[in-house]
């Protein structure tokens, strides 16, 4: 895609200036002071902004705009709903012991409603949600965490009036400017939708009739969450999406293609058992069940825990957590997929049968190719030795 860089820069700058004129929910807060108090230097911040600009597929010259977007983030109202989930996606951002740039930004954003961190409960919480929707009608971002039970809706009721999760989502989505499904449960159903899916848990996009941007992962990295907020702040539009409505800037490449162990895969060098000599040497984890060849995400680039590490870097294979129905299609997690039959809830309660069956067929076909490559590489290596 070709665009005029200068005009795009100017357009984003004008949009951010307009947003700056909006009322801030915490005008007494200075973002620079927040960073300074957490021991984050200007150099660290510039490095982070540069990395986020690259992650969002923006030129390095747009880094000042990324910083500018951060400064007006407290003008952007966010309503965050919890459905059937473990709160792991929120925990990906809510760190108190060692605050990161991402967690500070999350604290700085105009978070109008988030049940994990708000004081209100019961009738007061319900009123807070209603007031936030009315106050920021058509101007807020809706983020939903968790799958939504539909079989017997009373698997999930909330508030003093026992509204179902589906009812709450529909009500909040009606006046949202943009909607994000945060985590695999909200994006694709998650563990709640795993076979046999007794609660008929559904992803958000099957509950509401508005466009949903999926940000899957179990949990997604904090940068993938914050990055989408920044993108919306700068462009006022949805990012380019893949076939599963995931932002291409975050989910456009396979784990396998960007993995630091890829060279070992190509050379036929594999870990045969956890803890063996090959594991100590950092060989490929495919034979230990790594699902990197079938998974699209940017974990190897952005990593987790303040950019410290990621599952493969820590010695365990990818489990494919950002892919649809991964609990069913990617398990057992410590074994290669090969050409096995996959038992899922595809013919059951909540799945898109046609899409899921096609996806399963393609997944099995891909697995055959991966196994063939692995065996051939191993044979060549043994012959050379």
Q: What are the residue ranges of the model-derived segments?
A:
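Alpha-helical transmembrane segments
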Residues: 365-378
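Juxtamembrane/start-of-transmembrane alpha-helix segments at the extracytoplasmic/lumenal side
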Residues: 348-362
């Amino acid at each position: 895609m070709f665009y005029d860089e200068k005009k795009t820069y100017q357009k984003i700058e004008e949009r951010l200036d307009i947003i700056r004129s909006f009322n801030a929910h915490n005008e007494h807060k200075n973002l620079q002071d927040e960073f300074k108090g957490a021991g984050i230097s200007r150099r660290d911040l510039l490095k982070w902004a540069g990395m986020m600009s690259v992650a969002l597929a923006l030129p390095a010259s747009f880094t000042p705009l990324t910083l500018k977007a951060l400064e007006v983030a407290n003008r952007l109202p966010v309503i965050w709903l919890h459905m059937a989930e473990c709160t792991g996606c929120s925990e990906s951002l809510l760190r108190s012991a060692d605050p990161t740039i991402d967690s500070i930004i999350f604290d700085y954003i105009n978070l109008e409603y988030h049940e994990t961190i708000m004081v209100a409960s019961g009738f007061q919480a319900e009123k807070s949600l209603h007031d936030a929707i009315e106050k920021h009608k058509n101007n807020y971002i809706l983020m939903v965490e968790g799958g939504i039970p539909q079989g017997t809706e009373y698997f999930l009721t909330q508030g003093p009036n026992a509204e179902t999760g589906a009812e709450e989502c529909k009500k909040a989505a009606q006046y949202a400017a943009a909607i994000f499904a945060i985590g695999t449960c909200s994006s694709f159903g998650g563990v709640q939708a795993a076979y046999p899916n007794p609660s008929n848990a559904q992803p958000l996009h099957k509950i509401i009739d508005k466009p949903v941007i999926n940000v899957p992962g179990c949990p997604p990295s904090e940068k993938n969450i914050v990055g989408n907020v920044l993108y919306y702040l700068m462009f006022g539009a949805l990012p380019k999406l893949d076939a599963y409505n995931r932002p291409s800037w975050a989910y456009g490449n396979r784990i396998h293609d960007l993995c630091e162990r890829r060279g070992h895969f190509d050379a036929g060098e594999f870990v045969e058992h956890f803890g063996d000599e090959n594991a100590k040497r950092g060989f490929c984890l495919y034979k230990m069940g790594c699902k990197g060849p079938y998974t699209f995400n940017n974990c190897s680039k952005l990593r987790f825990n303040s950019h410290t590490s990621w599952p493969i870097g820590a010695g365990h294979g990818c489990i494919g957590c950002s892919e649809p129905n991964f609990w069913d299609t990617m398990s057992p997690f410590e074994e290669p997929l090969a050409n096995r039959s996959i038992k899922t809830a595809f013919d059951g309660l909540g799945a898109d049968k046609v899409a899921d069956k096609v996806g399963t067929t393609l997944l099995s076909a891909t697995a055959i190719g991966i196994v063939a490559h692995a065996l051939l590489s191993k044979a060549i290596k043994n012959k050379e030795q």
